[in-house]
Amino acid sequence: MERPNSSVAGLYSGLHGNGSVENLATEEEGLRLLAGAASARFGSSAGRGGGGGEPEGRPGPFNGIVTEPDPEEGTSSGQRGGINGQRGTKRKMENEGEDFLKELTLSLMSRRHHESVWWADLEDEFKNGEMNLLYKYTFEQLKTHWLEAWEDFELALNTFAKVALRPDTIYTIKKTVNIRKCAYVLGNGAVVRFQTCDRVAFNCAMQSLGPGLIGMSGVTFMNVRFVVEGFNGTVFASTTQLTLHGVFFQNCSGICVDSWGRVSARGCTFVACWKGVVGRNKSQMSVKKCVFERCIMAMVVEGQARIRHNAGSDNVCFLLLKGTASVKHNMICGGGHSQLLTCADGNCQALRVFHVVSHPRRPWPVFEHNMLMRCTVHLGARRGMFSPYQSNFCHTKVLMETDAFSRVWWNGVFDLTMELFKVVRYDESKVRCRPCECGANHIRLYPATLNVTEQLRTDHQMMSCLRTDYESSDED
C-alpha cells in the first residue's frame, strides 16, 4: 500500500493521480451542463414528435419537459403503466440517493485541511528519540487516508492510524482486524458488513509503545454503521482503551462490544442486538446518550460503570448489574417478552429489565433522576441501603429478594403506580427449565411473593412533598 504523493498540492488519496481537486470540480460542472443540454434537447424532440403540439407536462430540471401520461382507468394497460411508473419512481429515488452519496464523498475529499505529516513520519521521529511529539503535532496536522473497498482494513489502520471511510462505499470485513496501535476511524456514515466465520471482527489488543498526539488516544471509531446480519461473533473485543462515538449497530446476534479494559460509548445506537455493551471484571465502562431498542441484553456490567442520559425501549434487560455502577438520568420504557434466566449470584433468577445481582460485599448502585415506565426491577441483597433519588417508577413492578427487603428506602421517588413485592419462599413444586444468559439451561424455582407496597411506601400524610427530596438547587 503506497502513500499518496504529499509533495503535489491538491492531490488526495482515492482521486486521479494526474488531476487536482480544482480540475475535478471543473469537469463535474461541465458534465452537469452537458446533462442539462441533453435533457432540454430530449424534451424539444418529444414535442415535435407529438404532431406539432407541445405535450402537457411540467418544467423539469435543466429546462427540460417532464411529461405526465394519462393512463386509462380500469384497464390492464393502465394498471401495467402504474406498476411501471412505481418502479421507475423507485429506481429514480435510488439513483438520486447514490448521486447524493457520490457528491457528498467528493465534497468531503475535496476539503482543504491543515494536514502536513503522516503517521509513519511520526513513528520515525519517535524511533529517533523525539519525545515531545505530544506538543509538536496535533490531530489536525495528521494526514488522513481515504480507505477504498478493496484495501486491507488492518494494514491501513496500522500504517496510517487516521483513516476515513467513503459514504458511497460498502465495506466488507472478511477476517479479523487486529489493531495494536493507536487508530482513529472517521466513518462518515459508511456501512460496514461482515462475511467471516471468525469469532471476533475487530480485536483491539494492548498497544505497543509509540508516538502520542492530542486528540488521539487508544482506538476510536466515529459515525460508522455496522450491519451485522449473518455474523454470530463479537464485533469489538477490547483489552485497551476503546471509544465509540455515534456508532450504529443493527441485528447483531452476538456481542457488539466486549471490553476487558476501558470502553466509552457516546451517542451510539443498538437495534435488535443480543448483547450491546459488556464490561468484564476490572473493566471501566462509560455509556452516555445511547439508544437501545429491542435488544435482549443492552448492558452487562461486571466491573465499574457510569451510565448516564440513555434511552431504552422494549429491551428484555436494559441493565444486568453484577458489579458497581452510577445510573443517572436514564429513560427506560417497556420490556421485551423472554424467559431468560441469570445465574450470576449462584441462584437462578428470572431476568428483569433492571436487574441488580446480589453480592455480600459490593454496594448498591447510585440511582438518581431516572424514568422507568412499564418495567420490571429485580433487587438482590447488597451492602448498605438502596435509596433511589428523584426517580419515577411509572407502572413498574419491583421484586425484592428476602434479604433485600430491609435494605431499601423509597423516600424521594414518585410511587403512585409502583408495586413492591417481596420473595417469601421458593415453591419447589413449580420447577421450570429455562435458558440462561450464560448460554446453558438451568432449573428455576418459582418464587412465592407478597405485595408489600403499602408497608414500604412513604406515609404522605406525615411527610409533605414540598421538601428537598423532590427539589433541586437550580429550580426557582
UniProtKB/Swiss-Prot annotation:
SUPFAM superfamilies: Pectin lyase-like. It holds the Pfam family Adeno_E1B_55K_N. InterPro entries: Adeno_E1B_55K_N (IPR006717), Adeno_E1B_55kDa (IPR002612), Pectin_lyase_fold/virulence (IPR011050). One of its GO terms (molecular function) is ubiquitin-like ligase-substrate adaptor activity. GO terms for biological process: symbiont-mediated perturbation of host apoptosis; symbiont-mediated perturbation of host ubiquitin-like protein modification. One of its GO terms (cellular component) is host cell cytoplasm. Its main location: host cell. It comes from the Viruses. The keyword rRNA-binding does not apply. Contains a PML interaction motif that allows the subnuclear PML localization. Interacts with host PML-4 and PML-5; this interaction promotes efficient subnuclear targeting of E1B-55K to PML nuclear bodies. Interacts with E4-ORF3 protein. Interacts with E4-ORF6 protein. Plays a major role to prevent cellular inhibition of viral genome replication. Assembles an SCF-like E3 ubiquitin ligase complex based on the cellular proteins ELOB, ELOC, CUL5 and RBX1, in cooperation with viral E4orf6. This viral RING-type ligase ubiquitinates cellular substrates and targets them to proteasomal degradation: TP53/p53, LIG4, MRE11-RAD50-NBS1 (MRN) complex, ITGA3, DAXX and BLM. E1B-55K probably acts as the substrate-specific adapter of the SCF-like E3 ubiquitin ligase complex. This is E1B 55 kDa protein.
